[in-house]
């Protein structure tokens, strides 16, 4: 779990301590949902939101595990949708979505398809232009079953294949727009994501807005 200050949601000493932006190994996180619950309890948190990139698989795993614990602790279902707007990558957090809604299910399918397509195209170019041969399954197996593959996994696969000496080197050489082997992920707009989250009864929020130059324009 990433180290970040716990949030006191009421502002006073009696407030609820929580972390509302956590990833698991169902996307680019390191830990399982069960481990996240344990670490959160150890940190004295009372509520967390699991917001993996483009999937909601960790929530059911975490809540099932929580049933084995005799604790007052809340797990919120969430998601972080990767979107594109005018060549900017904008991440939209969604809290409390009804995942049974057809539009929400379709959004997940679109996002997963885009991730798979991007990964396969980058791997093809790595082999063709750089001689770095990586099987798609080598990337896919880096996330939990059904999880979201992405750039961190591609970078790690490049390093594992001997293409670079470190993951950071893989990023600096290959995983950026100026790289001859990089392919942009064709994904939905932030407006699409917000609409689907709203329509599914969820609450949309721009993730890390201070890192986005155009956040105020959205």
Predicted segments — roles?
Residues 45, 131-132, 163, 202:
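Short aromatic/hydrophobic-glycine micro-motifs
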Residues 35, 46, 53-117, 121, ...:
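Mid-domain alpha/beta scaffold segments of enzyme catalytic cores
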Residues 121-125, 157, 192, 196:
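Amphipathic alpha-helical segments that form well-ordered structural scaffolds
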Residues 132-185:
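Hydrophobic, aromatic-enriched interface-forming segments
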Residues 1-88, 173-180, 188-218:
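An N-terminally biased module of ancient metal coordination in phosphate/nucleic-acid-related enzymes
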Residues 12, 98, 167-169:
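Short, flexible segments with low predicted structural confidence
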């Amino acid at each position: 779990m990433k180290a970040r200050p716990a949030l006191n949601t009421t502002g006073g000493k009696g407030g609820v301590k929580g972390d509302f932006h956590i990833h698991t190994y169902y996307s680019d996180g390191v830990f399982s949902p069960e481990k996240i619950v344990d670490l959160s309890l150890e940190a004295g948190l009372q509520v967390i939101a699991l917001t993996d990139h483009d999937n909601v698989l960790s929530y059911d795993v975490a809540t099932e595990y929580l049933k084995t614990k005799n604790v007052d602790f809340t797990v919120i279902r969430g998601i972080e949708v990767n979107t594109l707007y005018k060549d900017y990558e904008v991440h939209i957090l969604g809290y409390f979505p009804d995942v049974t809604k057809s539009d929400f299910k379709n959004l997940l399918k679109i996002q997963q398809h885009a991730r798979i397509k991007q990964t396969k195209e980058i791997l093809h170019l790595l082999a063709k232009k750089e001689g770095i041969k990586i099987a798609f399954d080598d990337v896919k197996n880096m996330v939990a079953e059904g999880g979201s593959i992405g750039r961190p996994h591609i970078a790690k696969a490049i390093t594992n294949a001997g293409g670079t000496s470190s993951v950071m080197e893989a990023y600096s050489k290959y995983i950026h727009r100026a790289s001859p082997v990089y392919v942009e992920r064709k994904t939905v707009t932030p407006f699409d994501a917000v609409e689907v989250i709203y329509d599914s009864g969820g609450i949309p929020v721009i993730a890390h807005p201070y890192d986005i130059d155009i956040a105020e324009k959205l």
